């Protein structure tokens, strides 16, 4: 019986698998094309908007020599009442090697994994999980800090509604980082992690900051009269960081001068674009591992 691998959340990967994937991803940073997925088909189906995740998955497939088909949800039969399960069953009948799915409802990728015979990759489900984002964030931190064990990171912003925060809290904590949550009470989840409502309280002790977007689309009612009100307390500025050696991350899209100010986005300590670059490489490693089924390896074969 062939084992079908899925990536629904970060806990699907062992410590050794994560290390192997990140090592492999670093080899892909040369942007060279390979033939690992030659003759393989990957379908992307995103029920929520995406720029970085969707594009990087599709680029990852092509750099591995595979074929990718994007299902345009706005023109698909889901608009005619077809259930997502019927959609998945029909896509599965076309024999893809993997389906990458994003959905507003938590749990959808896990359900699809039980109704298809190909690998399912979670490209983000509601406020639940975004495993490949956490993997690329870990790679970015390792490349920026040298090592992450024993280091401290402050996650700042709309944590309660953030799938990125959920996945990073699990993965970074597993690799020995102390995760500190910074948010107003209405953005703070129930947790045993250390919490503060002002970044200034911990700025002198953290090695990295992860700023998060305020996810207004997941709020039932407006929380702030204006995002400027939020920014006055939580925007990451050069004045706040001073000359501290702190790596600054953000999963995107960035609300300029709300999450991070213009000057800080141009600062070399800001790793936002490095995250995007690392994202393609990480997704290459994930897709190769799930589809080929062999363990992540440091040795990357060059295309012929």
UniProtKB/Swiss-Prot annotation:
A biological-process GO annotation: 'de novo' pyrimidine nucleobase biosynthetic process
Catalytic activity: carbamoyl phosphate + L-aspartate = N-carbamoyl-L-aspartate + phosphate + H(+)
NCBIfam families, sorted: asp_carb_tr, PRK00856.1
Annotated EC: 2.1.3.2
Organism: Wolinella succinogenes (strain ATCC 29543 / DSM 1740 / CCUG 13145 / JCM 31913 / LMG 7466 / NCTC 11488 / FDC 602W)
SUPFAM superfamilies in UniProt: Aspartate/ornithine carbamoyltransferase
Pfam families attached to this UniProt entry: OTCace, OTCace_N
Residues at which L-aspartate binds: 80, 163, 213
PROSITE patterns named in the record: CARBAMOYLTRANSFERASE (PS00097)
Single Gene Ontology MF annotation: amino acid binding
Keywords per UniProt: Pyrimidine biosynthesis, Transferase
One GO cellular component term: cytosol
Family annotation (InterPro entries): Asp/Orn_carbamoyltranf_P-bd (IPR006132), Asp/Orn_carbamoylTrfase (IPR006130), Asp/Orn_carbamoylTrfase_sf (IPR036901), Asp_carbamoyltransf (IPR002082), Asp_carbamoyltransf_Asp/Orn-bd (IPR006131)
Name of the protein in its database record: Aspartate carbamoyltransferase catalytic subunit
Biological role stated in the UniProt entry: Catalyzes the condensation of carbamoyl phosphate and aspartate to form carbamoyl aspartate and inorganic phosphate, the committed step in the de novo pyrimidine nucleotide biosynthesis pathway.
PANTHER family membership: ASPARTATE CARBAMOYLTRANSFERASE, ORNITHINE CARBAMOYLTRANSFERASE, MITOCHONDRIAL
